[in-house]
């Protein structure tokens, strides 16, 4: 595993601008601040994960806007999770799960990675119930 981490890190595109190092992320198409060269792999992984999560949340919002003319009740976002509020009925749960799953499908179409991204949906009254 260590050889692959090093190989992936070395394959990333970097540049120095105004004395600051930057790393290109081919998934997000963004340049990320690179504190040290040893951070290349983690910058790539964390930047990609944050971008995918942000796009997933954005797709969820877009779907709700398209269907209902308003965004979902987004209560929180933590690392790779989003917390939404909805009615506590079987129909509302089914609809919300469908929206969240469709949103990750849209992200898959956008990023076109060599693996299919997925997500789990959990329902509950507290964060402990859904985490």
Regions found by a protein language model. Name each.
Residues 1-131:
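Conserved catalytic core of nucleotide polymerization and phosphodiester-bond processing enzymes
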